[in-house]
Amino acid sequence: MKMTVDFEECLKDSPRFRAALEEVEGDVAELELKLDKLVKLCIAMIDTGKAFCVANKQFMNGIRDLAQYSSNDAVVETSLTKFSDSLQEMINFHTILFDQTQRSIKAQLQNFVKEDLRKFKDAKKQFEKVSEEKENALVKNAQVQRNKQHEVEEAANILTATRKCFRHIALDYVLQINVLQSKRRSEILKSMLSFMYAHLAFFHQGYDLFSELGPYMKDLGAQLDRLVVDAAKEKREMEQKHSTIQQKDFSSDDSKLEYNVDAANGIVMEGYLFKRASNAFKTWNRRWFSIQNNQLVYQKKFKDSPTVVVEDLRLCTVKHCEDIERRFCFEVVSPTKSCMLQADSEKLRQAWIKAVQTSIATAYREKGDESEKLDKKSSPSTGSLDSGNESKEKLLKGESALQRVQCIPGNTSCCDCGLADPRWASINLGITLCIECSGIHRSLGVHFSKVRSLTLDTWEPELLKLMCELGNDVINRVYEAKLEKMGVKKPQPGQRQEKEAYIRAKYVERKFVDKYSALLSPSEQEKRIISKSCEDQRLSHARASVHTPVKSNDSGIQQCSEDGRESLPSTVSANSLYEPEGERQESSVFLDSKHLNPGLQLYRASYEKNLPKMAEALAHGADVNWANSDENQATPLIQAVLGGSLVTCEFLLQNGANVNQRDVQGRGPLHHATVLGHTGQVCLFLKRGANQHATDEEGKDPLSIAVEAANADIVTLLRLARMNEEMRESEGLYGQPGDETYQDIFRDFSQMASNNPEKLNRFQQDSQKF
């Protein structure tokens, strides 16, 4: 340490010492002014940056509004949406930069000024005070008369004590000066280095973002050239069509008599009809009617949602009405109601009656139930009913979930009664159900079965992957293991009371599960597992290919295997050193189920990503929050994190796993996912209410761990979740459930973790580079 004030001169209290003190004190005063000024400028810069981010967000909202307005133009909508999302990501990077600037410059330098400079000032005051006391003692000692021996001794004693106190305080003051002079260099350089690293991360993230966007921008430039050519071509075609229509003869209404049961848009016939109201006045109103997808619907205005008159034409009849005063009337009669309609002419009436009759005959010949596909809304066509973008998106989501789940073995029929084409599912069991069985499952309570529609509800990607990992065949092998032995027959469709009794016995009482017996202790099971793994190592691969489904990883669905189950790639974790004590086996090796503890089975299967074994363990009464005392009180959910499987975590959470249960080191699932860099799992746990403020035995919370690891994605998720939590607390009980930006970003991360996990490997790739 380089001393700026000499201790020897301090003891002498020489003029050189006083001059050095004066120089140092002036330098410290000037340093304080400079630091105060820098902190104020930093605060102003941060405030200006936050205002910039707010204005930029408003600008992004304007771009999104323009994209929504251009929803009919796929190129414009896609481009604007992609650009706004990228710019929104840059705003998030700016927000992180300003936060790091506040911590590196403002917080550190303010702490230096308030703590270290304050100690210097306190030491200075004490030094000045004792210096004054020393001067007074010297003067008093010099003034005392020699003949007054008592006063001479008293003055000498006071002078000695004062000198001793002065030397002590002066040495402390010099030490404080030297420490301050040395520390200020490290504090200033440390804060500036942290500030520069924040900028480095900011520009690195921006470079990565726009590197991905660059090829798309080049393609868009090429599309713009083609758009100019296509626009000129469309203009010429419209001019030709305009001339053709002007020359057409409109004297005949034969075009209104046409109907087509095989129309591509699903509309058999459409046109205006008068409809008699069902009120007391029996008024007649003119409405636009159409026959489509085995339904008769009408609407008043183009933007109105269509009203369904007949939900299923197979249940109705059509007939002429000659007993009323108005002409050209006909009636559509269903089991619950009838509808009186009037055409504009006799030809139109006959055409409508024939169209309805033909649609009824066609509906009986069709095998599929086409009515559910439109969800009571029509397909868009020129001059037809408007289904709306929202219904189309919902339809696509429903069809996608239905098709992907039903391709799993056994899922084409109800898991409990065998009725074909089930449209409901139990997400914690991983099975498909008919509508009647789904109602019975719902009555059991969510702790037994969580029911969701395969066509009406929106499915998260991780939940859809979970359904594709299980299926009716897998679950029934567990919950119906003793069905034939007990001589019990499954209920048939339509038997409500028999179904209810059977489902309650199957899932609540678990009567048909092959119970375990002669359970071993966890430590004994561990020994047998290891010994059995050595014996069966030669056959483990063959058994796994027959009995064990493809292991899931923190990645997306790649392809459908031969049995219809969605196959996921199996990778070795890059953090293989971060495992509980004891060597892990590469494939699942279990004891005979008759001697296996369900809790340990669930624990091991969670690490091995073996969902069928996990479901079997839960069926045999395994506690989903079971803690392994031999491995630091780790839980199955923590094991799922160590195994790197997003789907396994989702399965445990759906079955009641505690997302905040911690091991002996004070680390919960969120801690472990952060340490391992599993971004998808971090996103999942935050959505399920994980406490990110919890600290482990080292006093570290997940955010501090992510910051130390420089994992930008996880840091972003944790800080957004924390900001959203603070916003909700500030808004009180009636606040919004979450910021829109927060929800959008978490939705994007969920989609990325399930479908494009390679994009979340930026942290590991960057670590390998350095």
From Swiss-Prot:
GTPase-activating protein (GAP) for ADP ribosylation factor 6 (ARF6). Doesn't show GAP activity for RAB35. The modification Phosphotyrosine is found at Y734. ANK repeats lie at residues 632-661, 665-694, 698-727. A zinc finger (C4-type) spans 414-437. The ANK domains are required for interaction with RAB35. GAP activity stimulated by phosphatidylinositol 4,5-bisphosphate (PIP2) and phosphatidic acid. InterPro entries: ACAP1/2/3-like, AH/BAR_dom_sf, Ankyrin_rpt, Ankyrin_rpt-contain_sf, ARFGAP/RecO, ArfGAP_dom, ArfGAP_dom_sf, BAR_dom. It comes from Mus musculus (Mouse). Residues 399-520 form the Arf-GAP domain. Residues 371-391, 542-572 are annotated as: Disordered. It is found in: Endosome membrane; Cell membrane. This is Arf-GAP with coiled-coil, ANK repeat and PH domain-containing protein 2. Pfam families: Ank_2 (PF12796), ArfGap (PF01412), BAR_3 (PF16746), PH (PF00169). It comes from the Eukaryota. GO terms for molecular function: GTPase activator activity; phosphatidylinositol-3,5-bisphosphate binding; small GTPase binding; zinc ion binding. Residues 379-388, 550-561 have a biased composition (Polar residues). The lineage of its organism: Eukaryota, Metazoa, Chordata, Craniata, Vertebrata.
